[in-house]
UniProtKB/Swiss-Prot annotation:
This protein's UniProt keywords: Aminoacyl-tRNA synthetase, ATP-binding, Cytoplasm, Ligase, Nucleotide-binding, Protein biosynthesis
GO CC annotations on file: cytoplasm
Catalytic reactions on record: tRNA(His) + L-histidine + ATP = L-histidyl-tRNA(His) + AMP + diphosphate + H(+)
Source organism of the structure: Clostridioides difficile (strain 630) (Peptoclostridium difficile)
Gene, per the UniProt record: hisS
NCBIfam families in the cross-refs: hisS
Name of the protein this chain belongs to: Histidine--tRNA ligase
Enzyme class: ligase
């Protein structure tokens, strides 16, 4: 057990870590283009934060959160998603006092107790965007455009952007009464989960994953057909803006998302992987959340989250390879004790000039040193022997062309700066 990671967690080894850095750097690059700044929040928060934001009746709160009491008898939860913590930080640090909108991004681990499977771990990692202080559909369109551009730039172009409107408290009041009446008539054929949701949060029934139950409610009324004038206008404008940016989309009335804080726009982005579809991003608008968590009234928000593990699996499934950018510029092969000692100064000089360099540290033979230099894909190998030291020289080998030249040690660093 001591040498095995806990179920639902995974080590990111050097053979994989560069892929993570690549997509993370690309995400940061795209966020900067859109004017988003990084927000870093703790990996644990007060449990009540998630109960009030994500929702008491959600699967996340009821079944999936890692919650515990700390030594001060405080209820603490490892964050299962990124939005609640960012909104809490927005309120606590009074970012609403700055010029609005506040445009934030985050890169964070999250934790949910789920059955581990491909692309879904108990500790997983998310990129996320939150834009607070704008209730306009243009903000919704920008968020979606940012996500699409990010996916395009990492190589995912065959995307389906699915959008819906889940309404607001005004249109939901009438709709929920209609929905409750419909679901009550189906109570005998609903699954246990849906019957529980029918009482507490009827719209969540639309999100049911039980195939039999879904078939039984295939004629369920959708909120998108019962929007108030304001929500309908908002949704129509969003579509207009997406069309203007040539972002292809479909309207999917079944998208309600699994969190209680969504209002108006909800969306998912799906990648058409080889032989399967994979949801790589989901988000929506949460206009009442800031006030609900104790912040000022009237501050709207919208955001999305995307799982890094699932993204990397999707890239792999689409045959998109990420090249490892890390390689060693120079490897020093030493022959003799004095040459080995003198190589340390050369190694230091190279590194201080921002030339990546390495040498043997386990007393390999000369042949094994050359073999190792080739294995790590070094660009040049420098050979230093005791005899060469007397003449202040070394042999420089180009590992790609196998060309060898004799160079002066005193000018070697400057020569390499020209060659690299």
């Amino acid at each position: 057990m001591l040498t095995k990671a806990p179920r639902g967690t995974k080590d990111i080894t050097p053979k994989e870590a560069y892929k993570w850095r690549y997509v993370e750097n690309k995400f940061r690059e795209i966020c900067a283009l859109y004017g988003y700044e990084e927000m870093v929040t703790p990996i644990f928060e007060h449990t009540e934060l998630f109960k009030r934001s994500v929702g008491d009746t959600t699967d996340i709160v009821q079944k999936e959160m890692y919650s515990f009491k700390d030594k001060g008898d405080r209820e603490i939860t490892l964050k299962p998603e990124g939005t609640a913590g960012v909104v809490r930080a927005f309120i606590e640090n009074k970012l609403y006092a700055d010029t609005q909108p506040t445009k934030l991004f985050y890169v964070t681990p999250c934790f949910r107790y789920e059955r581990p499977q491909a692309g879904r771990q108990r500790q997983f990692h998310q990129f996320g965007i939150e834009a607070l202080g704008s209730d306009t559909p243009s903000m919704d369109a920008e968020i979606i455009a940012l996500a699409v551009q990010f996916f395009n730039e990492v190589g995912l172009n065959d995307l389906v952007v699915s959008i819906n409107s889940v309404g607001c408290p005004v249109c939901r009041k009438e709709y929920n009464a209609l929905l409750k009446e419909y679901l009550d008539s189906k109570a005998d054929i609903l699954c246990d989960t849906c019957n529980e949701r029918r009482e507490k949060n009827p719209m969540r029934v639309i999100d049911c994953k039980n195939p039999t139950c879904k078939e039984n409610i295939k004629d369920i009324p959708f909120i998108a057909d019962h929007l108030c004038d304001d929500c309908k206008s908002h949704f129509d404008k969003l579509q207009e803006y997406l069309k203007e940016m040539n972002i292809n989309f479909v309207i999917d009335k079944t998208i309600v998302r699994g969190l209680d804080y969504y209002r108006k726009t909800a969306f998912e982005i799906i990648s058409n992987d080889i032989g399967a579809q994979s949801t790589v991003c989901g988000g929506g608008r949460y206009d009442g959340l800031v006030e609900q968590l104790g912040g000022p009234k009237g501050i709207s928000g919208i955001g999305f989250g995307l799982g890094i593990e699932r993204l990397l699996l999707t890239l792999e499934g689409n045959g998109i390879e990420i090249e490892n950018p890390q390689s060693t510029d120079i490897f020093i092969v030493t022959i003799g004790e004095e040459a080995n000692t003198r190589s340390f100064k050369l190694l230091k000089d190279l590194r201080q000039n921002h030339i990546s360099a390495d040498k043997d540290h386990i007393e390999r033979s000369v042949k094994a040193q050359f073999k190792y230099s080739d294995k790590i894909n070094s660009k040049f190998t420098i050979v230093i022997g005791d005899d060469e030291l007397k003449n202040d020289t070394a042999t420089l080998k180009n590992m790609k062309t196998s060309e060898q030249t004799t160079v002066k040690l005193s000018t070697l660093v400057e020569e390499l700066k020209q060659k690299l």
